């Protein structure tokens, strides 16, 4: 794996609140190696460990992107939905930012069928084929299209399982992580002090509740993906 310098700045992480964990009563003992202190009843994440694992994650996604691999970013918190979509679009990644449907990856044949329905309905709407149908049927089809767009819009171009999955909230996206583990898909996950670092291939110790923290980590990963994609384009 290529090791590169990703300009991960300690001051920047402190300003973003990356180091703030959960209350000490909510912690997961498996996170002990990644905690540096307790402050006013709250665990403080060791940012040296954050820097190390974020660098490793950036190296991994850079190498994968430079080989033309595909990525899926998963973050279904309401506050993070727009951030996930904009970051994924910027790096040309697939994304899920509304709801993770159980079996989205493990029952890939069903997901592919839904995506096919979605693409067909979009094509019919653009070709104005709905105009020839009764109003009631048009309303039903438009409602179905709207639902498919809301939940599958971020993976509408996905034709196969992703090569790497990035998860922004381990506890909220537990099912997604389990599906990746079953399928052997490498995962990168933020790991707050109440998380289990063993659930992902690379767990980045970081605050997964504050938008500034999530944005900083995601931006570093997206930058590394974009750099890798640029290298892939130059070589092909």
Curated annotation (Swiss-Prot):
GO cellular component, one term: plastid
GO MF annotation terms: structural constituent of ribosome
Entries under CDD domains matching the protein: RPS2
The keyword Translocase is annotated on this UniProt entry: no
InterPro entries for this protein: Ribosomal_uS2, Ribosomal_uS2_bac/mit/plastid, Ribosomal_uS2_CS, Ribosomal_uS2_flav_dom_sf
Pfam family, any one: Ribosomal_S2
BP terms from Gene Ontology: translation
Entry keyword set: Chloroplast, Plastid, Ribonucleoprotein, Ribosomal protein
Cellular localization per UniProt: Plastid, Chloroplast
PANTHER family recorded: 30S RIBOSOMAL PROTEIN S2 PROKARYOTIC AND ORGANELLAR, SMALL RIBOSOMAL SUBUNIT PROTEIN US2M
Protein family per UniProt: Belongs to the universal ribosomal protein uS2 family.
Protein name as annotated: Small ribosomal subunit protein uS2c
Species, as recorded: Oryza nivara (Indian wild rice)
């Amino acid at each position: 794996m290529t090791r590169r310098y990703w300009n991960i700045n300690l001051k920047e992480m402190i300003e973003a609140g990356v180091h703030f964990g959960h209350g000490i009563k909510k912690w997961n003992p498996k996170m002990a190696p990644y905690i540096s202190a307790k402050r006013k009843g709250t665990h403080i994440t060791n940012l040296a460990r954050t820097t190390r694992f974020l660098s490793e994650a950036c190296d991994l996604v850079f190498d994968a992107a430079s080989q033309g691999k595909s990525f899926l970013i998963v973050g279904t918190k309401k506050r993070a939905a727009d951030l996930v979509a904009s970051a994924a679009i910027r790096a040309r990644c697939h994304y899920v930012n509304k709801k993770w449907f159980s079996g989205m990856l493990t029952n890939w044949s069903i997901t592919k069928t839904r995506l096919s329905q979605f693409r067909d309905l979009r094509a019919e709407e653009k070709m104005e084929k709905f105009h020839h149908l009764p109003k009631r049927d048009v309303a039903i089809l438009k409602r179905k299209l709207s639902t498919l767009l809301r939940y599958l819009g971020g993976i509408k171009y996905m034709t196969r399982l992703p090569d790497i999955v990035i998860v922004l909230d381990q506890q909220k996206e537990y099912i997604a992580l389990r599906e990746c583990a079953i399928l052997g898909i490498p995962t990168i996950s933020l790991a707050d002090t109440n998380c289990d670092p063993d659930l992902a291939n690379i767990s980045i110790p970081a605050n997964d509740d504050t938008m500034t923290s999530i944005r900083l980590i995601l931006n570093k990963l997206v930058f590394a993906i974009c750099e890798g994609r640029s290298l892939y384009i130059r070589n092909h």
